[in-house]
Amino acid sequence: MSQDFVEIAKIGATYKLDGELNLYPLANSIETLISYGDWYIQLPATNVWQQLKGESVLKRADKVYIKLANINDADTAKKYVNALIGVPKRALPQLAEDEVYFKDLIGCSVKNINNDSFGVVVDIIETGANEVLVCKEDNSEYLIPYVKQYIVSEDLNSKKIVVDWEYDY
């Protein structure tokens, strides 16, 4: 399958003896994930996405679980622990011109207007007020607010971000 996939959840440990597994969504709501349509799974030992069929997603209190079709015991379910759940990138909503998916920022090189390197984006922190790029360069880590005031340019095709930021901020 040559489609580009986006990870939307990760499978955790088994939950019940009937093969139910913990599901850790990478979105704010399970409803958002369900709206994407067909889900695909990538087992930890492979790099192949396979379509899921007949799975059930259950929400109990603030926890989410997945029951995979034809998996009826915890021992069989264990091979799915740490598997990724994804959807084809085309299933995601189109973004406005000034919007990006966080996953597209991961791996971007970050330099300032003086061409000083902050390394690459390894994570994004959601603070409530704004997002913060977590950049790593060698043994140093830099936190750069992801707001228009500091982002000079982004070229996600070439994975480059230019910021108006200094080492000592």
UniProtKB/Swiss-Prot annotation:
UniProt subcellular location: Cytoplasm
- Annotated PRC barrel domain ranges read 97-169
Q: Which GO terms describe its biological process?
A: ribosomal small subunit biogenesis; rRNA processing
Task: One Pfam family, please name it.
Answer: PRC_RimM
The similarity comment for this entry is: Belongs to the RimM family.
What is annotated about its quaternary structure and interactions? Binds ribosomal protein uS19.
- The protein's name is Ribosome maturation factor RimM
